[in-house]
């Protein structure tokens, strides 16, 4: 049987480009996982770039599990760059902020070197769990003059572990025998180092006189891993200091991550946020 058919389709594709080395630290190399647009006849515009930092309680990240979900976000019209940072087991905070800076600067260089369809004027930082703590701390360190990194138009935080003191009061994550916040800071316990823990928390750097990009936050009300009080506290601090922030608390939900943050309602909110900040 032979048939001729006509098929209407969008020839815009999204490709996965693995393992871009962005920095060699000597004792380790760190890489990016990139999802980018492609059209055989060429692209007519440049796309906003979302730098995504996976959560892993600041330990070694699993860089591949989220890629299918991140592809759904990419198809809304974005480049996704997933950043592998140095885990707390080999380098204590704040070296991870340096990693984010180095990753972004690497992408800027590649944009110019290879004429990539990435819009260097529309960079966003996004993180989940411990990754969102690092994303927020990166823009705060930049705003306070501690580092200088490419301009960020907005920050997207999912289930943020923004307050290390709140995190230290939660039960240990399954499979861990040592508190992740203590490993992150290189101390024996948070209880004996509360000042250090506070200084590594987002609230410690938020002031009215600094300039921050708009912040979009999500957290499940009954998150079983990272207390929702992290996001509530961060939202209140940003509001009190007159910074632009939107917070969506997902009621009656006991999820920490996964498909909930890549559902159509959440993706639509992210899409609207990015359009409003361009």
Where do the PLM segments sit?
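Alpha/beta-hydrolase superfamily serine-hydrolase fold, recognizing
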Residues: 1-278
């Amino acid at each position: 049987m032979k048939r001729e058919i006509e098929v209407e389709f969008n020839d815009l594709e999204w490709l996965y480009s693995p393992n871009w080395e962005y920095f060699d630290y000597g004792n380790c190399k760190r890489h990016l996982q990139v999802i980018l647009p492609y059209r055989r006849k060429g692209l007519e515009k440049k796309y906003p770039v979302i730098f995504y930092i996976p959560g892993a309680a600041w330990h070694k990240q699993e860089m591949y599990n989220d890629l299918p979900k991140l592809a759904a976000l990419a198809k809304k019209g974005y480049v996704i760059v997933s950043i592998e940072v140095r885990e707390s087991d080999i380098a204590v905070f704040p070296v991870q902020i340096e990693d984010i800076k180095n990753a972004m600067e690497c992408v800027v260089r590649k944009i110019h070197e290879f004429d990539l369809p990435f819009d260097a004027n529309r960079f966003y930082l996004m993180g989940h769990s411990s990754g969102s703590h690092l994303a927020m701390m990166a823009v705060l360190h930049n705003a306070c003059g501690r580092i200088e990194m490419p301009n960020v138009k907005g920050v997207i935080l999912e289930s943020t572990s923004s307050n290390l003191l709140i995190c230290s009061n939660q039960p240990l994550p399954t499979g861990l025998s040592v508190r992740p916040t203590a490993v992150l800071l290189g101390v024996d316990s948070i209880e004996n180092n509360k000042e250090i823990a506070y200084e590594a928390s987002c609230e410690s750097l938020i002031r009215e006189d600094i300039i921050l990009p708009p912040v979009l936050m999500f957290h499940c009300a009954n998150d079983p891993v990272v207390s929702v009080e992290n996001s509530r506290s961060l939202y209140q601090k940003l509001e009190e200091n007159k910074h632009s922030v939107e917070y969506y608390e997902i009621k009656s939900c006991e999820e920490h991550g996964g498909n909930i943050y890549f559902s159509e309602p959440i993706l639509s909110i992210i899409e609207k946020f990015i359009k409003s900040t361009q």
